Amino acid sequence: KIDLCDNVKTNKWIKYYEDRDYIVVPIDLINNPNTKIIFDKIKPLIDEINDKRISKGLKPRRARILVMGVPNAGKSTLINRLVGKKSTNVGNRPGVTKTLEWIRINDKVELLDTPGILWPKLDDEEVAHNLASMTAIKEEVLDCEDIAIYIINKILSDYPDNIKDRYNITNTGDIVDILDQIG
């Protein structure tokens, strides 16, 4: 969901993981659903594994790749884009994928679609609010008004002009007033 992210912060995370030798593939599955870049990145890995198998006298195998993340992160949407058709259910809420399911992408790759994974107990209030803000946890877990206030405070802290410009708000001192102006 790179289309929803801050480019500066995203680039810092990309650098962080690339510095640790991870393969990073930022992708926008909504506005640019071209997933060829993903196959371009994983093909050398698959070839390397199968070359080792062949050198040991074994047959090459289809790569089996685990797709995991927090609920509502776009795992099933990614798989559907890679397959090129709707093969898994998707929804803009957590808990749509309920079981593990192997999806054959092509003759070289199978992906394991998984339900979202979270910590068993969310003790950190900020973590819980961040997850609720991105609809990774069910609405019933936290109060919607508390989440809205948290989101507005976060936007005012990180991007103060965005909320003012988007909703034509002049006074950003009172959160309840801002909620009223937006609503």
Residues covered by each model-derived region:
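Short, well-ordered alpha-helical segments in soluble proteins
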Residues: 42-53, 82-86, 94, 109, ...
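Conserved active-site beta-strand-loop modules that form the wall/rim of enzyme catalytic pockets
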Residues: 29, 79, 109-112
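Helix-rich effector regions associated with P-loop NTPase G domains
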Residues: 8, 23, 91-183
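Canonical P-loop GTPase G-domain recognition
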Residues: 5-69, 87
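Glycine-rich phosphate-binding P-loop
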Residues: 64-84, 114
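Conserved P-loop NTPase mechanochemical-coupling segment
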Residues: 79-90, 179
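Glycine-rich, phosphate-binding/catalytic loops in enzymes
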Residues: 14-16, 84, 127-131
